[in-house]
Amino acid sequence: VLRLRTISGCSTCGTCPQFSIITASNSPKAVLLTACARSVGIPAQLGFSDVRNHLSTQKLLDLLETDVFMWHGYSVLYLEGKWVKATPAFNIEMCTRFGVKPLGFNGVDDSFMHEFNEQDKKHMEYLTDYGFFADLPHERIITSLKSSYPKFFALVENNKSIKDSF
């Protein structure tokens, strides 16, 4: 699990009062995986998609007012002559909680979230593909999230805890 400390305002846009809340998801894991790959000489990019998560908690759905999760992040690594997608998303605790198999990554095939859980219920559905980026498109992501999740950002901007909403 990637844990980040809360800081006062992000250094990129200065408008996010608690940057760690916003980045405590799959996107920072993708940024970290991409940076780690690059640090050992593996060409890597960031990829983003909107997804529909059919196994979300009701608290989170109420907070976001939708089941569409925008800007789901993943890494794209250049291995053995081709680009391979890798989703660094759920830890084993989340997989167990929602009855999904942990994602495997063999370095040859794309590793995306499973479409169905272990009970054959819909789990993850990929909707919009934003493409690949050399760097995190932070301003674009924040602008998009603020317009799509006003209730969430109202809590964040008022320094309210959202910890129990997940």
How would you describe each model-predicted region?
Residues 6-7, 21-22, 42, 92, ...:
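Weak global preference for isoleucine
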Residues 51-166:
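His-Asp-centered catalytic microenvironments across diverse enzyme cores
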Residues 16-17, 45-50, 57-58:
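N-terminal start-of-chain detector that recognizes signal peptides
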Residues 10-16, 36, 78, 95:
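Generic recognition of cysteine residues
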